[in-house]
Each structure stands twice: as C-alpha cells, then as structure tokens.
Regions:
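Short juxta-domain linker segments that transition from a proline/glycine-rich
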Residues: 1-171
Length: 171
C-alpha cells in the first residue's frame, strides 16, 4: 500500500543524516545484545539516544519514526541506495513489549543476513526469515530453557511468580 511506501520514504529521510561506522558489524552487534536489552529499564529519552549510538557503532542508522494511520508496521530494515544500513521502528500503540520484541526481531534479521531483502514487519507477513527473526527475538528476551523450566515448575498464573521470573531473566 501507498501508506507503507510513504513510511519507508520517511524512514530513509530520517536516517540520511545519521553517521555510521562503516558497514554492518554483526559480531559487534551480537556483543551489544545484553546492553541493548538492559536499556528496556531506562527512560525513553535515554534509550533512544543510546540505541542510536550503539547501532551507529555497529554500522546501522537507527531512528524511531512516527507511524501513519493505516500502516500496520512495527519495524523496517533496508540497505539504502547509498549503501547505508537502516533500521527504523515505530512506537505503535505505545506498547513497550511490542517495541522491544520488534527491535530484537529486526536485529535478528540483521544478524541473519536478511539485509539483501527489504524487510517491513507487519502482522500479515509470514516467511521462513520472519520465523527465524521471531525465534531470535523470543530467545533473546527469554531463553527457551528458562521459559520451559518456569512453565514446568512454577505457577505461571501467579502474578508474584511471573514478576520474580521476569526479574530473573531481566525483562
């Protein structure tokens, strides 16, 4: 749809003046995952600036771009015409859980080498690359072994136990 194309163009415009350190450095990005995850607990003005710095260091121009009504988009990666790697996000519906999952999903695309294809993430897209990025995001937020242990041995309907578990996995 045209609204999606317009949002992508806005992303390109928002990131064109962001300086990055060369090409995408996936090893450095992978090493920054815990730092990125720890930003979940900061105020929005702190983590937006820190994310821009981290991504620029890893060779990616990062921006949070307001979403348009009718554009069911959460995140977007692209290698621009001038060769710059772009990662744009929305804060659609104001939900932190969606934002952080989608951010890690987009990082999964970057680490999986999916930059050769333009990826726009919205709910109707289903593919192997999307499934791999989803799995990466899930395991980055809550390691599967810990999740299975929690659901097997704890009362996952008990709010207190959920909070304790969330603290133990740093989410």
């Amino acid at each position: 749809p045209y609204v999606l194309f317009a949002w992508q163009k806005l992303c390109e415009k928002e990131t064109e003046n962001i300086s990055v350190n060369g090409e995408l450095n996936t090893e450095l990005l992978r090493s920054k995952l815990n730092t990125i995850k720890n930003l979940m607990f900061e105020k929005i003005d702190v983590w937006t600036e820190k994310l821009q710095e981290i991504f620029a260091e890893c060779g990616v121009a990062f921006a949070i771009v307001h979403n348009f009504k009718g554009a069911p988009v959460q995140g977007f990666i692209k290698k621009s015409e001038n060769g710059k790697n772009i990662l744009c996000m929305t804060i659609r519906n104001g939900r932190a859980d969606s934002f952080w999952f989608t951010l890690l999903h987009e990082i999964g695309h970057l680490l999986n080498g999916d930059l050769s294809t333009r990826f726009v993430d919205f709910s109707s897209v289903v593919s192997d690359a999307e499934a791999k990025a989803d799995e990466f995001a899930m395991n980055s937020l809550i390691p599967v072994e810990q999740y299975l242990k929690f659901t097997r041995f704890c009362d996952y309907h008990n709010e207190c136990e959920i909070h304790t578990f969330a603290q133990s996995v740093n989410v």
